[in-house]
Regions:
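C-terminal regulatory/interaction regions
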Residues: 17, 296-361
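Conserved beta-strand hairpin/beta-sheet module of binuclear metal-dependent hydrolase folds
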Residues: 71-118, 207-210, 215-220
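Active-site neighborhood of phospho(di)ester-bond hydrolases with catalytic His/Asp-centered motifs
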Residues: 102-104, 130-137, 155-157, 217-219, ...
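Active-site HxH/HxHxD metal-binding segment of metal-dependent hydrolases
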Residues: 117-186
Length: 361
């Protein structure tokens, strides 16, 4: 990353932290609790935390340097382009009728139009966004939608519309064009195939296929070169999430737009992700068959939740350890997030698949 890009990144992070602090300060969470919350003894003093050390990021996981304005834009194939701020990704397709935009991440924000302007000027094409496709309803991938005005045709799954109407967020206008299973977007001589294959990260997360550009966009499933963050990218349907890469690989494509991290993905990235999650699942099954719950529940007696926590922590740590050892240096942040991912896979194995459940005699 260039120094100027680092400054841009730091500025955006400072803005985020400042905004978060303001929101937290304005919220009266304590008011809903009887008697409120006691102030810490030294409310005015904040100690400097001791931060953990983590393994270096493998060079293969890193993307290209950002420009002075904090973004990178490049061609995927022909007139399909991708944009990243190093953490989030978007894509756009230039056509003779205007620009088709796919997701509008809040952190990229106004840089989306700057990236489009840059490409349009270089190629002598229109920079007007005519259509915006939502991958799903989450604000981190759609929070800059309102920047493109009211005349843009917004397209999404029918559940995306329901959820956005529920959320009533003015930054994310609900799509006016919706579909249940399949929709082909035709505009300016181009075609894009949208499909819903069931719940995964969210109930409305869709597959965006560019058949004439050898590209698939599937957001919040595989982070190319990186492990998933908390709880499989904060996914709502774990079995659906785990199955999604197999569906992705059933499409013909060469380039993968994941919605996150700073580089494009490949089919090998998706295969590696599958192996990582499969290893976690196998290790969880071994841990469930190996770790004895008895000492945890005996030790804590009537405090059942303490027994549950310490037992599941022990199973999770047992299952995560060999996976962390195998993938550190292969997938970025393996040592950061594998334990939290292991817990959610473990619980899905127990609760969704019934592994380890015992019926009282």
């Amino acid at each position: 990353m260039t120094p100027s890009a680092s400054r841009a990144s730091a500025t955006s992070r400072r803005s985020f932290l400042t905004g978060t602090a303001a929101v937290m300060g304005a919220s009266s969470i304590a008011a809903v609790l009887p008697g409120g919350l006691a102030e810490p003894a030294s409310a005015g003093a904040v100690s400097t935390p001791t931060l953990p050390d983590y393994a270096p990021v493998p060079p293969s996981s890193l993307g290209p340097a950002l420009n002075d304005q904090g973004y990178y834009v490049a061609r995927v194939k022909r007139n399909l382009y991708w944009v990243t701020d190093g953490t989030y990704q978007s894509a756009f397709l230039t056509t003779r009728a205007g620009v088709l935009l796919f997701d509008a991440p809040a952190t990229i924000g106004h840089n989306l139009q700057r990236a489009i302007n840059e490409i349009a000027a270089a190629n002598g094409v229109s920079n007007t966004v005519t259509h915006l496709v939502y991958s799903h309803h989450h604000a981190d991938h759609a929070g800059a939608s309102s920047l493109f005005g009211k005349d843009v045709v917004r397209i999404g799954h029918e559940e995306t519309r329901r959820l956005l109407l529920r959320d009533n967020d003015p930054t994310r206008p609900a799509p006016t064009v919706t579909f249940a299973d399949r929709y082909t977007l035709h505009s300016g001589g181009e075609r894009v195939q949208l499909a819903w294959h069931g719940s995964n990260h969210t109930p409305d997360n869709i597959y965006i296929h560019f058949p004439d550009h050898d590209t698939l966009m599937l957001v919040d499933i595989v982070n190319s070169g990186w492990v998933p963050i908390y709880n499989l990218n904060l996914s709502e349907d774990v079995p659906g999430y785990i199955a999604a890469p197999t569906t992705a690989l059933s499409y013909p494509w060469k380039h993968f737009i994941s919605g996150h991290v700073g580089r494009l993905g490949t089919r090998n990235d998706v295969h590696l992700h599958q192996q990582y999650v499969a290893d976690i699942a196998a290790s969880c099954k071994t841990a469930l068959a190996t770790v004895d719950p008895t000492p945890y529940f005996v030790n804590y007696g009537a405090n059942q939740w303490a027994g549950v926590k310490t037992y599941l922590d022990a199973v999770t740590d047992y299952a995560a350890a060999p996976v962390i050892a195998k993938y550190t240096g292969v997938l970025a942040a393996t040592d950061v997030f594998t334990t939290s991912t292991t817990l959610v896979v473990l619980e899905s194995i127990r609760l969704d698949l019934g592994v380890g459940s015992q019926v009282h005699p």
